[in-house]
Structures are given as C-alpha cells and as structure tokens.
C-alpha cells in the first residue's frame, strides 16, 4: 500500500468524510464541537488508511468549496460562514491531529499529524 492507492471512491467514499464536515464548520469559527460530532468524524477517518487520510481530508475540503460554486484558485466563502479561509485550511489539515490519528507524510514513512497538502489548499 502507498499513496498511489488513495483513489477517491476506492480508498475513501465520495463525497469524502461526511461526518467531518460539521466538525470543520464548527471548529473554523471557534464554536464548541459536540463530543458526538468529534467521535463520528474521528471514527470515519480511522477507517481510512493512514496513507490516505490527508487525501480524504483534501477531497472533503475541495468538495465543500466546489459545492458552493468556488472554482480552483478562488474560494467561495459560502461553505464556511464566519470563517477565514486560512483558518479553514489549517483546521481541516489538523483534524488528524485532533483525532490523534497518524498519517504518512511521505514515502520514507515518517509519521506526522498535520496534513501539509491540505494546509496548502490552493483555493485560498
């Protein structure tokens, strides 16, 4: 297994991580996240291979923006009312850390907790 196995629809369902969407919407503007919301999101993420968790989070963020009419390179704020875009990206990138789920950041197998590619999402 490796990052090349992380195809959307195979490594994770599409749309990705539906249980993590409410978590992201709440967390990005500093709202309290109910325990059940956190648990559901972390459970969903835990079912995805550690190679593919960042890809799934990236796919989730991407689809949340695109559903609200954002094109590549221009962010729609409709997906995340009252949230700054850079906060949205960092919040999404940190969901693995919030859930304490390791990720594989590169082929050397180094484990980490924050998805750098998600934090660098190009729409913002």
Curated annotation (Swiss-Prot):
GO CC list: extracellular region
Pfam families attached to this UniProt entry: Tryp_alpha_amyl
Subcellular location: Secreted
Modification(s) after translation: The disulfide bonds are essential for the inhibitor activity.
UniProt keywords, alphabetically: Allergen, Alpha-amylase inhibitor, Disulfide bond, Secreted
Disulphide bonds in the chain: 6-52, 20-41, 28-83, 42-99, 54-115
Tissues with expression: Endosperm.
Predominant location category: secreted
Molecular function per GO: alpha-amylase inhibitor activity; IgE binding; serine-type endopeptidase inhibitor activity
Function field: Alpha-amylase inhibitor.
Family: Belongs to the protease inhibitor I6 (cereal trypsin/alpha-amylase inhibitor) family.
Subunit structure: Homodimer.
Protein name: Alpha-amylase inhibitor 0.19
Taxonomic source organism: Triticum aestivum
